[in-house]
């Protein structure tokens, strides 16, 4: 019922948006233009992009046609059109931590700074970067010296989904540290009939190869590890075989091996989310987007029983992982000014607030603080906002040859989960690091591809780590 109310409120809000348009920009200056974009499949396409495209066309006279494809197909189609300098491609949707380095290095994305400064194209109240959350801004540039070639608009977050009802029933402390996380997973692995097949598993996360890099990132950095490090001479080398990184691999592997169902070894995020919604796990490490499935009374057995908190801190601190999504303009577009007008319109305060109300986590501060916005749960709102403000988007190793390097990191994780011996993990990490260094030496000469590293992030303090738990009234459990 609550989800339906949120959707209805969002629909009513969307119908009245045109009256909010900024008067200092002539929104109809490119009337009759058609823009083409290639976007990837996501919940926000139907929840926000399609209704907004209709509003945009009504207000500006510009038609937006976007082809929506699953990730691999989208990337292939974008690559073909960009490599061919196809002028028919205007708008590019991308995650900078996944595609930004490659497309920036190739020179495929337009520098947006001149458009941002043009008062005829950008509303005077646009408030960039002032109204953008810090973590989102950290993700826009992945190569040092990179031009401002994208506008980040949405920030999903890798959070810990928890069954609040089970934590209350068994009086288990809601975790703020990695040690407490494992303790909670142990206590909430529930085998009621003693047959060795738990009715509820304590923990669930991605457990298959390269896909684990996205969910593993927060654990890696919280333990003090990293994908890469910089030598004194400035060269970039792999760091996945450092003590801290191997500690993280070992911990994450043990959590999957000891407290998750065997299907986690091959599941993709949708399958894990479905298991959690079916009541088969007490905790799920996944994007905050999946809360919608867990809270849907038509699809979930745990509707009203789940919320989200930040991934617990490690010995190095807490670095929330926020896979952000950006909009960019093809360098070869024939409609660059009209394309920027679309981006500027879509990322105005009132338009992004509409997305926020349609359950799409936005990168504007005002979207979170507006008095009319009500999050799905208090803890979901707090954890998602804190992650977007403090987080870093380095779910995947920042490199041109990102696919190859994710595969190598995935092999280390496979050993961590299936074998678990420290010596075996270290040996695989050493082997992977050597191969990664060879790849980087061939593909990234002359580049400072540092990405949004923890050293650039704001330090998350203990009170922030605890804030979502307090917001849900769960902070006194386990005492």
Per-region residue spans from a language model:
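Glycine-centered hinge/linker elements that transmit conformational signals in sensory
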Residues: 184-187, 231-265, 307, 311
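Short, well-ordered beta-strand elements
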Residues: 31-43, 62-67, 90-91
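Long, aromatic- and glycine/proline-rich binding clefts that accommodate carbohydrate-like moieties
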Residues: 128-131, 137-141, 304-310, 357-417, ...
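Extracytoplasmic "Venus flytrap"/periplasmic binding protein-like
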Residues: 51, 55-132, 165-176, 274-275, ...
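Mature extracytoplasmic/periplasmic domains
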Residues: 55, 273, 289-297, 325-404, ...
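Extracytoplasmic/periplasmic solute-binding protein
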Residues: 137-153, 158, 182-237, 281
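Short, solvent-exposed loop/beta-turn-alpha elements that line the ligand-binding surface or hinge
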Residues: 28, 113-131, 193-194, 202-203, ...
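Hinge/lid segment of periplasmic solute-binding proteins
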Residues: 24-29, 99-157, 215, 219, ...
């Amino acid at each position: 019922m609550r989800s339906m109310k949120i959707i209805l409120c969002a629909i009513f809000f969307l119908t009245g948006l045109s009256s909010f348009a900024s008067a200092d920009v002539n929104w109809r200056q490119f009337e009759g233009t058609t823009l083409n974009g290639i976007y990837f499949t996501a919940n926000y396409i139907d929840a926000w992009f399609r209704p907004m495209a209709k509003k945009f066309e009504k207000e500006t006279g510009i038609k937006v046609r976007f082809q929506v494809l699953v990730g691999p197909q989208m990337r292939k189609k974008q690559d073909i059109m960009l490599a061919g300098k196809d002028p028919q491609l205007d708008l590019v949707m991308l995650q900078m931590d996944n595609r930004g380095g490659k497309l920036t290095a190739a020179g495929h994305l337009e520098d947006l700074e001149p458009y941002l400064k043009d008062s005829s194209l950008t509303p005077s109240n646009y408030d960039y970067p002032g109204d953008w959350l810090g973590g989102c801004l950290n993700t826009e540039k992945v190569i040092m010296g990179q031009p401002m070639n994208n506008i980040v608009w949405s920030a999903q977050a890798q959070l810990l989904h928890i069954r609040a009802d089970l934590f209350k029933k068994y009086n288990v402390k809601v975790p703020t540290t990695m040690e407490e996380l494992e303790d909670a997973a142990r206590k909430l692995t529930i085998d009621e009939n003693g047959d060795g097949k738990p009715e509820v598993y304590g923990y669930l996360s991605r457990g298959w190869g390269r896909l684990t890099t996205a969910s593993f990132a927060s654990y890696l950095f919280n333990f003090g590890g990293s994908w890469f490090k910089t030598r004194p001479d400035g060269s970039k080398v792999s760091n996945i075989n450092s003590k801290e990184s191997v500690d993280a691999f070992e911990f994450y592997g043990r959590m999957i091996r000891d407290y998750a169902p065997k299907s986690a070894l091959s599941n993709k995020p949708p399958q894990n989310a479905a298991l959690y919604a079916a009541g088969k796990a007490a905790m799920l490490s996944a994007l905050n987007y999946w809360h919608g499935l867990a809270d849907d009374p038509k699809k979930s057995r745990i509707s009203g029983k789940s919320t989200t908190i930040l991934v617990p801190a490690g010995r190095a601190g807490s670095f929330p992982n926020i896979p952000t999504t950006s909009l960019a303009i093809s360098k070869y577009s024939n409609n660059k000014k009209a394309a920027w007008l679309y981006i500027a319109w879509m990322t105005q305060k009132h338009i992004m607030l509409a997305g926020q109300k349609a359950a799409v986590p936005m990168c504007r501060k005002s979207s979170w603080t507006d008095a009319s916005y009500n999050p799905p749960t208090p803890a979901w709102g707090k954890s998602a906002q804190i992650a977007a403000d403090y987080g870093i988007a380095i779910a995947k190793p920042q490199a041109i040859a990102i696919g190859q390097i994710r595969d190598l990191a995935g092999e280390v994780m496979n050993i961590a989960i299936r074998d678990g011996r420290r010596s075996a993990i270290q040996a695989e990490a050493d082997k992977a690091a050597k191969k990664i260094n060879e790849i980087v030496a061939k593909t990234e000469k002359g580049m400072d591809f540092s990405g949004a590293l923890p050293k650039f992030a704001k330090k998350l303090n203990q009170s922030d780590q605890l804030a979502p738990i307090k917001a849900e009234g769960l902070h006194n459990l386990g005492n």
